[in-house]
């Protein structure tokens, strides 16, 4: 029995030793791999590609090996076959730098003008704007025009500059006769709203000759928003001219709110604005008159404008202003002006209850506060 016990203990001791040695070897192995990984990166940076090629196969089990593979693929992307890129993406779907590889390779296939190969590689729309433009151009090049023009329109309608790769798609769309001139007007409006004067000027200059009058007026307005009254009086009133005038008006209000306030009646007359369009201008000015430095006339005008407004955020801003100045009467007035949905917010429930307590309506105040507490659980 004692002999058997001694044998068991020897076996256990041997097992522990083997495990310790194994772990030490594994630790050494990881240290060596880490060292070789650093060697490869340095050799790569120094363009010592023979060293890179010799050491890379020894790191296939190292956790960071996919990063080396990614660099190997992208350093020579123009010569990579589709299957290599596809296999890498499928094998490393969560690798952070690999997430943009699909879009990069779509652009590479576009450079090769391999339109069918591009669509086979990326059956779905890629992520980046440049790749999307190449994707929809490939649709056009392979006869799928309806999809191509739908994609072109989606990419066109932005106030931002688009990548050069989009020029081919937009050019094909324009040449097909399928691009509505109104899409120019809509993009000009978006560019104007984004403050992209250069794009406004470029787009206006590309418009058909029968749009020359409005094109010239738009360029002048983009370069000098303060000329908005001249623009409003010299162009026929359309939805487009009204929208452009509103965007320019917002710019005027930022620089000179009083000038903008006094300008509203003239813009209303020149562009035949309805009540909703007029209120949009009032709202723009009212937002700019929330400080303590306004005149009595401006304050009365502002409150009248807010009283007519359908903008919940503007009315809420006025409530906060009343709170900030300790204006209890104003607080009551503007809380009452909030739509029912906004009144149910915890913030406004509290102040409604506070006002009820002040007026001696304790039960109503408790109901409001208890509802607020219950809704917060």
Positions of the model-derived regions?
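N-terminal leader/linker segments that initiate helical-solenoid repeat arrays
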Residues: 21-71, 220
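Residue-level signature for tetratricopeptide repeat
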Residues: 42, 71, 75, 108, ...
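Solenoid-repeat scaffolds in large eukaryotic assemblies
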Residues: 49-52, 81, 85, 98, ...
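Conserved small/polar residues in nucleotide/adenosyl-binding loops
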Residues: 367-376
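Alpha-helical adaptor scaffolds
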Residues: 72-74, 89-90, 102-107, 282-293, ...
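Structural register within alpha-helical repeat arrays
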Residues: 39, 69-72, 105, 135, ...
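Post-signal peptide N-terminal segment of secreted/secretory-pathway proteins
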Residues: 51-150
């Amino acid at each position: 029995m004692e002999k058997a016990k001694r044998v068991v203990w020897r076996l256990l001791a041997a097992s522990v030793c083997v495990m310790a040695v194994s772990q030490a070897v594994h630790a050494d192995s990881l240290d060596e791999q880490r060292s070789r990984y650093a060697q490869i990166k340095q050799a790569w940076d120094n363009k010592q590609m023979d060293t890179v090629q010799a050491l890379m196969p020894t790191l296939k089990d190292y956790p960071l090996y996919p990063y080396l593979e990614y660099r190997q693929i992208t350093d020579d992307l123009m010569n990579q076959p589709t299957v290599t890129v596809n296999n890498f993406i499928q094998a490393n779907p969560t690798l952070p730098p690999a997430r943009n590889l699909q879009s990069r390779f779509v652009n590479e296939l576009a450079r090769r003008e391999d339109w069918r190969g591009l669509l086979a590689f990326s059956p779905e729309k890629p992520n980046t704007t440049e790749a999307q433009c190449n994707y929809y151009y490939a649709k056009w090049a392979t006869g799928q025009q309806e999809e191509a023009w739908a994609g072109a329109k989606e990419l066109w309608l932005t106030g931002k500059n688009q990548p050069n790769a989009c020029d081919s798609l937009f050019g094909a769309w324009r040449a097909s006769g399928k691009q509505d001139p109104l899409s120019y007007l809509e993009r000009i409006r978006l560019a104007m709203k984004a403050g992209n004067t250069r794009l406004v000027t470029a787009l206006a200059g590309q418009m058909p000759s029968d749009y020359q009058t409005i094109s010239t007026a738009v360029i002048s307005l983009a370069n000098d928003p303060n000329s908005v009254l001249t623009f409003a009086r010299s162009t026929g009133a359309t939805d487009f001219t009204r929208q452009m005038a509103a965007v320019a008006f917002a710019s005027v209000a930022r620089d000179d709110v009083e000038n903008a306030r006094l300008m509203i009646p003239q813009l209303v007359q020149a562009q035949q604005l309805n009540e909703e369009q007029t209120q949009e201008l009032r709202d723009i000015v009212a937002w700019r008159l929330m400080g303590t430095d306004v005149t009595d006339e401006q304050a009365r005008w502002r409150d009248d404008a807010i009283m007519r407004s359908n903008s919940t955020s503007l009315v809420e801003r006025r409530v906060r202003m009343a709170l900030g100045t300790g204006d209890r009467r104003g607080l009551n007035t503007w809380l009452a002006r909030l739509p029912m949905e906004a009144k149910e917010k915890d913030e406004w429930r509290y102040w409604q209850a506070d006002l009820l307590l002040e007026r001696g309506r304790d039960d109503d105040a408790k109901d409001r506060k208890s509802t607020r507490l219950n809704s917060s659980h």
